[in-house]
Amino acid sequence: MYRNSEYYPDPTAGAALRQLYRKEKDLNTGKQFEAAWKKSMPPDAWCYRLKDSAASYYGGNESLSFSIDNICDFDVYRYPMHHYFELKTIETPSIPLEKILGRFDRDKQKYHKLKHITDMAAAAAYRGQTAHVVINYYRGKVNRTFAVPASAVLDYLNTQTRKSIPWQWAALHGIEVEQHQLRVHWRYDVDGLLRKLEEMEDNA
């Protein structure tokens, strides 16, 4: 049937625009968290932000052949320890596994970015190194941040049937990162987190 687009606009346009808006909002929120995390670094810690994958700038297309494939978001060193941090934000009380592990490939039956977390866990197996997924549950009654070991995320994937990680599980298996709000932005007690990780290393 003929449809005059001037009087009968594409009914899918609104949904598409809303989806693009949500993606942009998520990206902006994630970038704000990363910026706040870096500004929260103690002065005696070296912090390097690894470059984003090209997929981040092309609508989340994870199959780009020229896409950079970094192990995590932040590489941090403070004597005597080396830390890997992957940062994630979510506005719901439970974060989908695809938000951490990438798109699930039904043909291969695995997550696209599973190797990132696997490599992080492997790195943390060496003395003096840690690897954590830092999850910021930033909306509603939760509004808390937890550093969850990469190995614990893998254990969750292999032992749980849920396709998302609730904040209660993150609180139980991770380390809470204290936070406080400035006028607009947030600051995180990264120094306190590093101290706890150093103490855990000393007691290992």
Residue ranges, per PLM feature:
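Catalytic phosphate/metal-binding cores of nucleic-acid and nucleotide-processing enzymes, i.e., regions
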Residues: 1-204
